[in-house]
């Protein structure tokens, strides 16, 4: 039973959240969560919520690809140590993906992001479009990535969202086959890294430290008593946090996968939802789920009836014989694939990251 004090707190909290979101600029929504199961059953899921088609396709990227940070003459340069399967945005950015070592990277919208001013003279630049790819190319584990990123080897360079007059503002989440997790944000021009296995959930606004504080309140109430039900980021964070801990910790990988899919669907926004008074809420266009142990990358579009997967274990990622390949998902990701779609990838010319 909820006492009067809790009811008052709930009312105040709701009012604060409503006021905060009402003043926020238009933003897009996504959710990411990590399931920590027994016997190494680690599963990461994310939803992509966006107001229009992000022209997503899936790509196989082998090791050995030489890349530039696409930030002008003073760009960071590297060669991919690991192969990866990625989901692109507009085929000019990596929005989501997993490498052959089991590291997953996801970028989600965060309107509060403020990146250091890039002058082209000090540290080399890295286009925000390749931020996730840099992690996938260079690191096998979250700990390894965090150790390197703490040294700040580059400066993030952002640009406008394609077709829009606003800057791209993102934060990055990493998870690996051990269940380790990290959230990387840029707040007031400074990099902030939250690194701990317990950081299983990430959504959008507010910043991650504030999300944790709000979630602590809901944990005190208890998810079996009441959970916030709107599509707002803070509510999705609370629901995802409760359910990813509450679902059975299955040794059976397929049952664990079913539970994780049910959670990421629970925090998805109905397709076609248009709420003029809540412009920060957008439809879920697709979902991805990674089984880190079995190295399977699942993809589910809102506009097709099937969930399909890519089996990283069967892919030639070698620098010598591996090939860049693309799975064409079609407009609004409406091409239908079923089961193991790995053989359906076709040889393709490597896409170029959007940069300066």
Residue locations for each model-derived region?
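Bacterial N-terminal signal peptides
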Residues: 10-22
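Bacterial N-terminal signal peptides that target proteins for export
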Residues: 1-13
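Aromatic- and glycine-enriched pocket-lining scaffold segments that form the walls
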Residues: 142, 146-184
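Sec/Tat signal peptide C-region and signal peptidase I cleavage site
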Residues: 23-29
